[in-house]
Amino acid sequence: MKKICVVTGSRADYGLLRWVMEDIKNSNKLSLQLIVTGMHLSPEFGYTYQEIEIDQFHIDKKLEILVSSDTPNGVNKSMGLAMISFADAIDELNPDIVLVLGDRFEIFCAVSTAMIACVPVAHLHGGEVTEGAIDESMRHSITKMSQFHFVATEIYRNRVIQLGEHPDYVFDVGSLGIDGLLKLNLLDRDALQEVLDFSLGEKNLLVTFHPVTRDRNSSIQQLDELLAALSMLKDTHLIFTMPNADADGRTHSQMIYQFVESKSNSCAFSSLGQLRYLSCVKHVDGVVGNSS
């Protein structure tokens, strides 16, 4: 059986990878290996590895890589630790293919070590554009280190080919998020309010604002202006999800928590998980922020 090693580092990529992992797990031709790292293993971000275990996936390796700093220097040190950790994990697991999604720095490190170890990489959701963030450079770099590409649209397929990848290995398979929407039984309004321990209003917004990693100085100003605008919506209830583990992420989190403490019509969660997040999307009037 071919060993497919899936790497997940955050609530975001796991929500999309889950159904691919299910199919690999249930295959009689493939064997699932799972490396969990990054924000999944941090209490600050909700220990979301527990959701993976609740979904009955066996975790082969837990790689703790996040240093207690959200400065650019701290992120660089986390990347260094990630490179060392992934080198050992991939050497021990000896997978036939490493399967990754997206553009975060921990995924960049996983793919870098796989490339050096001559392990083929399959990359999901390449060819996309994220203006104002280092994700853009990370994603295209991951593309160049990968051998198989599974993209969401023909536009993204063309972009991956423009980067020099062979068309025979670039597949337009659609968005994985659609699979999740079709397979999940979303919560009704009453059930959602119960699991959130928060009452929805007549008007509701779901808010996520990540650090703008290519413009740190304006990022905090942008969030400050966003919170000021939201504070003017007296008749609107606000549900915040917290930022990623990026440079200045903790500063952004502190600003949001301070805002929520002073507003009875708002709440904040380190992680909602896929079911609660998509259920929120179903029932709110709008989604606000800069999350992709």
Labelled PLM ranges:
Residues 33-38, 149, 238-243:
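Short internal beta-strands
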Residues 31-75:
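Conserved nucleotide-sugar phosphate-binding/catalytic loop shared by glycosyltransferases and other
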Residues 26-33, 58, 234-238:
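A generic structural motif
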Residues 100-101, 123, 149, 273-292:
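A donor-sugar binding/catalytic signature common to diverse glycosyltransferases
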Residues 3, 96-97, 204, 286:
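Structural motif
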Residues 7, 41-43, 146-221:
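A nucleotide-sugar donor-handling region in carbohydrate enzymes
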Residues 52, 187-283:
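Donor-nucleotide binding loops and adjacent catalytic segments primarily
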Residues 5-8, 14-25, 65-167:
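Active-site and donor-binding regions of nucleotide-sugar-utilizing enzymes
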